[in-house]
Amino acid sequence: MQHKRSRAMASPRSPFLFVLLALAVGGTANAHDDGLPAFRYSAELLGQLQLPSVALPLNDDLFLYGRDAEAFDLEAYLALNAPALRDKSEYLEHWSGYYSINPKVLLTLMVMQSGPLGAPDERALAAPLGRLSAKRGFDAQVRDVLQQLSRRYYGFEEYQLRQAAARKAVGEDGLNAASAALLGLLREGAKVSAVQGGNPLGAYAQTFQRLFGTPAAELLQPSNRVARQLQAKAALAPPSNLMQLPWRQGYSWQPNGAHSNTGSGYPYSSFDASYDWPRWGSATYSVVAAHAGTVRVLSRCQVRVTHPSGWATNYYHMDQIQVSNGQQVSADTKLGVYAGNINTALCEGGSSTGPHLHFSLLYNGAFVSLQGASFGPYRINVGTSNYDNDCRRYYFYNQSAGTTHCAFRPLYNPGLAL
């Protein structure tokens, strides 16, 4: 079903206006996570997260699952430095990729909370992240801390964008999303060495450097980059001829409403798509790379493809993955199929309502809004809430034909835009 609409509906607008329209206001249908609300920052809370006057914010690029994480061989690192954790390699890689948090961040926090990775005792294996998580068990704590970091990171970014849209100052204290996420988490639960003068990020930076040999100049970033990064991210959209839809050219699938990667909160970086939205046990279909790039297999059910420009797409609930780490692919290269079995679709746990592809857009490791992104001839308008399926607000606009395509209606993939 297609609805002819005026081209004016899809005309460019102010990035900050789009931000206001696209900020999360709820919605948990088809949620991929635990239905937790977005982390809400306030001026009062941020007043408790001040960096020491001599400190610089942490580099977002080393916090997120971007180029540094993709170049990191987690399994080999664990085999050499933490053999007791080697069988957890896929679990760590999967959830680090899902939340797009560098696994080095997680390993650093483990050392800070439970001691050296090389010979963990029974307590450390049961609670590797100590007081940072109220959960019990290795797997539960790992996922909980990654989830907390993700919620805090994007909650801070959302707060900054709201402030900018209201024409209020942002970034004046040099605090960025990575620093806010880690500082908030560490202040709540971590033991801070008196040597660090009560500065949890100082202890974190020293531990990170010791574990991975990262120069201080790379681990930190100038304070004046914060506001510039925010302004640039608000206007982000991939080149109009870079991406196609993530299913075979010549086929029609049915996407649902845009939502955050976890199904609640911000940004609306993701949509789910299926050929016919069947029940578990039904036939499923080929998932393809939406663009050219380098493959990262995050687990048996999750793949990422990263373009040299920094744009990336994530593919979750996969089966029969037929690409490998480091492989170069072009747009429309088959990656696998979306899983028809719930245990395969959720290979490392989680939740899902039925067979589908969970597709996400990222830039330099950060989830970014689909607003204004083009996939072939279609430009997306994300709506005003998670899983907003109302075609007056959420739609794929065919820029060539001037037609608007609604959620849960077959959407034909003609390939890349010419």
From Swiss-Prot:
Its EC number is 3.4.24.-. Its cofactor is Zn(2+). GO terms for molecular function: endopeptidase activity; metal ion binding; metalloendopeptidase activity. Induction: Optimal protein expression in vivo requires both Zn(2+) and Ca(2+) during growth (at protein level). It is an enzyme of class 3 (hydrolase). Binds 1 zinc ion per subunit. It comes from the Bacteria. The keyword Secreted applies. SUPFAM superfamilies: Duplicated hybrid motif. GO terms for biological process: peptidoglycan catabolic process; protein secretion by the type II secretion system; protein transport by the Sec complex; proteolysis. Belongs to the peptidase M23A family. Involved in proteolysis and elastolysis (degradation of the host protein elastin). Has staphylolytic activity (degrades pentaglycine cross-links in cell wall peptidoglycan), preferring Gly-Gly-|-X substrates where X is Ala or Gly. Enhances the elastolytic but not proteolytic activity of elastase (lasB) and elastolytic activity of other proteases. Degradation of host elastin is likely to contribute to the pathogenicity of P.aeruginosa. This is Protease LasA. It comes from Pseudomonas aeruginosa (strain ATCC 15692 / DSM 22644 / CIP 104116 / JCM 14847 / LMG 12228 / 1C / PRS 101 / PAO1). The gene is lasA.
